[in-house]
UniProtKB/Swiss-Prot annotation:
Part of the 50S ribosomal subunit. Contacts protein L29, and trigger factor when it is bound to the ribosome. Keywords: Ribonucleoprotein, Ribosomal protein, RNA-binding, rRNA-binding. It comes from Ruminiclostridium cellulolyticum (strain ATCC 35319 / DSM 5812 / JCM 6584 / H10) (Clostridium cellulolyticum). This is Large ribosomal subunit protein uL23. One of the early assembly proteins it binds 23S rRNA. One of the proteins that surrounds the polypeptide exit tunnel on the outside of the ribosome. Forms the main docking site for trigger factor binding to the ribosome. GO terms for molecular function: rRNA binding; structural constituent of ribosome. GO terms for cellular component: ribonucleoprotein complex; ribosome. The lineage of its organism: Bacteria, Bacillati, Bacillota, Clostridia, Eubacteriales. InterPro entries: Nucleotide-bd_a/b_plait_sf, Ribosomal_uL23-like, Ribosomal_uL23/eL15/eS24_sf.
Length: 117
């Protein structure tokens, strides 16, 4: 099991990602080997939010030149994470048919992302 800090590398801030923050979508650069479920658990652990959806994109590293020498840039992975902006308490039935509510508090935004809504 990897730590959440090893999975989420840094936020990916562009004009498009700033516009999607209002809809609850945050963009991160993540570890290339990480899966969607690992990304979901890492974001929920780091930022105390409820993740609804994770979309990932893989990017191949470009070949760059310095004089006559060529070398590749590393491949990277981008994840767009949609969070629940209006979290409601979860209700379920316990033994005996009693209704139990889970009052876990989730945040409605990620303030640590660097951009306020």
């Amino acid at each position: 099991m990897r730590l959440p800090q090893d999975i989420i590398i840094k936020p990916y801030i562009t004009e498009k990602s700033n516009m999607e923050i209002g809809a609850g979508k945050y963009t991160f650069i993540v570890d290339v080997k990480s899966t969607k479920t690992e990304i979901k658990k890492a974001v929920e652990a780091l930022f105390s939010v409820k993740v609804l959806q994770v979309n990932t994109m893989n990017f191949e590293g470009k070949v760059k030149r310095t004089g006559v020498h060529e070398g590749p840039r590393p491949a990277w992975k981008k994840a767009v994470v949609k969070i629940d902006t209006d979290p409601k308490p979860v209700e379920y039935l316990a033994k005996g048919g009693k209704t139990v509510t889970n009052n876990k508090k989730y945040k409605t935004s990620i303030e640590e992302f660097g951009v306020a809504q």
